[in-house]
Amino acid sequence: MSVKGQFNMRNAAADTFAMVIFSFITGMMIEVFVSGMTFEQSLASRTLSIPVNIAIAWPYGVFRDYLLRTGHRLSPSSWMKGLSDMVAYVLFQSPVYACILLAVGAGTDQIITAVTSNAFVSGALGIVYGQFLDACRRMFKVPGYCRELSHPEPQHQEM
């Protein structure tokens, strides 16, 4: 594993901010309107997800950046960036989401429905989240991350 950049507090803060806000909003909408969870179950799930999202935000950013670099080597096109964002989101978030739902007492059918729905919707969510994360990184003035850069300079360790 080669070091591509040092740990950067701005980067970690931007990744954490983006993950907590985006996951709370999209997760609640999916849980209540798609999987049939009650508002109370969803609120419990979203509340539990906050510390989890704080813990996984930076590792997700590292994973996403790795997939973006890998995808960019295959094709520098914008569709590859979108595909890389989608794949990163689905692969990283689905197991975490299933564990959160299990911990708050969702039934097996609810978990399967929520995770499957989230995986399908993640095609769009992963791309939207990638754009949101990019915007948060610019807002937090992450070093090496600027508006013109569609593929960020590595800020994390390469996987």
From Swiss-Prot:
Keywords: Amino-acid transport, Cell inner membrane, Cell membrane, Membrane, Transmembrane, Transmembrane helix, Transport
Source superkingdom: Bacteria
GO molecular-function terms, A-Z: L-amino acid efflux transmembrane transporter activity
GO cellular component: plasma membrane
InterPro entries linked to this entry: Ala_export_AlaE
Entry's transmembrane regions: 17-37, 48-68, 86-106, 110-130
UniProt-annotated location(s): Cell inner membrane
Disulphide bridges: none
Pfam families: AlaE (PF06610)
One Gene Ontology biological process: amino acid export across plasma membrane
Bilayer disposition of the protein: Multi-pass membrane protein
Sequence similarity: Belongs to the AlaE exporter family.
Function as written in the Swiss-Prot or TrEMBL entry: Exports L-alanine.
Name of the protein this chain belongs to: L-alanine exporter AlaE
UniProt gene name: alaE
